[in-house]
Amino acid sequence: VIADLAQSTHVFLVDNFDSFTYNLVDELRTMGMGLTVYRNSVSPHAIFEKMQAQAKHSQVILLLSPGPGAPADAGCMPQLINLVKGVFPVLGICLGHQAIVESYGGDIIRADVVMHGKSSLITHQGDKMFANLPQPLPVARYHSLMASNMPAELTVLAQFDAVPMAVCHEQDRMLGFQFHPESILTAFGSQLLMQSIDYLTEEQAND
């Protein structure tokens, strides 16, 4: 099943000029995913048109990489989310997660504690993309900002204390992780990444 999913899914990865992007590229290639990488300096409309063209041949997913700064500073990413929302599934990691929350009207604020290469035990719902994973789950955190005033449209799937660590919008097929599944500090990160892509593309396959 995983092999079939990989062969039928093409990932469009937006690189927010972050070193973790290369970890994601390696993970996706190991999974056998089709992959196209764009820097966030590329026109959002150009990326969206490429996704529409690819969707005629395979399932398509948008992956938003980690990166420095705030979502508003991340080039085409905020505008691209609005173009893709409800059309193609989206997975956002760290900065990408924050951009998803902001796109639905949530706030991004400075976190009380800056996390840089720290591991935290998050609690999760134990189903969907978190199925068959440890509870709590050790994850890697690299962030000084966090989501706040969570919009009603988003469901919090995992958290650490009061910090939302995973959110989703089921109808729009949007999923965000504040942590880094591609880091070696995250337990079962490869499994989580694959189950997340599986979850996001499941409905698309049935369309």
Give the positions of each predicted feature.
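Catalytic beta-strand/loop cores that center a nucleophilic Ser/Cys/Thr
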Residues: 128-171
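Cysteine-nucleophile active-site neighborhood
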Residues: 58-131, 138
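A glycine-centered loop/beta-turn motif at secondary-structure junctions
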Residues: 161-203
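Short loop/edge segments at beta-strand edges and connector loops
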Residues: 39-40, 110, 141, 158
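N-terminal beta1-alpha1 cap of cysteine-dependent amidohydrolase-like domains
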Residues: 1-88, 95, 187-188, 194-207
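Histidine-centered divalent metal-coordination motifs
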Residues: 94, 143, 180
